[in-house]
Amino acid sequence: MKKQTLRIGVGGPVGSGKTALLRSLCSAMRDYYNIAVVTNDIYTQEDAKFLTQHEALDADRILGVETGGCPHTAIREDASMNLAAIDQLLERHGALDVVFVESGGDNLSATFSPELSDFTIYVIDVSAGDKIPRKGGPGITKSDLLIINKTDLAPLVGASLDVMAHDAKIQRGDRPFIFSNLKSAQGLDEIIQIIVSEGMLEAKEIPAAKAVV
């Protein structure tokens, strides 16, 4: 029976911490799972270069897709470029356990095509204000996991984490959300646990994740 690769879509606004999250996840999981990454940028491959330069994975496990125009189209209406990139990674590395697909910076209405993503993570950050969860949108309400990142900035911007938690619960119902601060690895172990359990990956004894950003 052919092994199924778990495809995880990672979306969120520009600057919310998507690429930093991928760097952290790859660093923590790469010795235990066969992983690759596809990044999306409009006119550059900056996110792919960032991950390569910081040795999140070997360079041949990271592919950058230049979407041109609207980045939403490449993850939703026409995912062909991303699907081709995944196929290329599978040809290189055989049966991958996980492929992360990072979207270009998007808004709260962005969603991944089911053809492209089996599990979706949406990243917002505290610096945008504590009203973001209540604004809703598919990224907030429908993603499999919502990450509220950069909790260390809450006092600096006057944001209430209690308000954000309250609104996230209302918007998401039973769907999980996690507060994170990747600079201290806060929330990272819990994120990995959810990916493994919900993605039906083989459970392994992974040490506590360390901050790498």
Curated annotation (Swiss-Prot):
<keyword id="KW-0996">Nickel insertion</keyword>
<keyword id="KW-0342">GTP-binding</keyword>
<dbReference type="GO" id="GO:0043419">
    <property type="term" value="P:urea catabolic process"/>
</dbReference>
<comment type="function">
    <text>Facilitates the functional incorporation of the urease nickel metallocenter. This process requires GTP hydrolysis, probably effectuated by UreG.</text>
</comment>
<keyword id="KW-0963">Cytoplasm</keyword>
<dbReference type="GO" id="GO:0003924">
    <property type="term" value="F:GTPase activity"/>
</dbReference>
<keyword id="KW-0143">Chaperone</keyword>
<dbReference type="InterPro" id="IPR027417">
    <property type="entry name" value="P-loop_NTPase"/>
</dbReference>
<feature type="binding site">
    <location>
        <begin position="12"/>
        <end position="19"/>
    </location>
    <ligand>
        <name>GTP</name>
    </ligand>
</feature>
<dbReference type="GO" id="GO:0005737">
    <property type="term" value="C:cytoplasm"/>
</dbReference>
<comment type="similarity">
    <text>Belongs to the SIMIBI class G3E GTPase family. UreG subfamily.</text>
</comment>
<dbReference type="Pfam" id="PF02492">
    <property type="entry name" value="cobW"/>
</dbReference>
<dbReference type="InterPro" id="IPR004400">
    <property type="entry name" value="UreG"/>
</dbReference>
<comment type="subunit">
    <text>Homodimer. UreD, UreF and UreG form a complex that acts as a GTP-hydrolysis-dependent molecular chaperone, activating the urease apoprotein by helping to assemble the nickel containing metallocenter of UreC. The UreE protein probably delivers the nickel.</text>
</comment>
<dbReference type="GO" id="GO:0016151">
    <property type="term" value="F:nickel cation binding"/>
</dbReference>
<dbReference type="InterPro" id="IPR003495">
    <property type="entry name" value="CobW/HypB/UreG_nucleotide-bd"/>
</dbReference>
<keyword id="KW-0547">Nucleotide-binding</keyword>
<dbReference type="GO" id="GO:0005525">
    <property type="term" value="F:GTP binding"/>
</dbReference>
<protein>
    <recommendedName>
        <fullName>Urease accessory protein UreG</fullName>
    </recommendedName>
</protein>
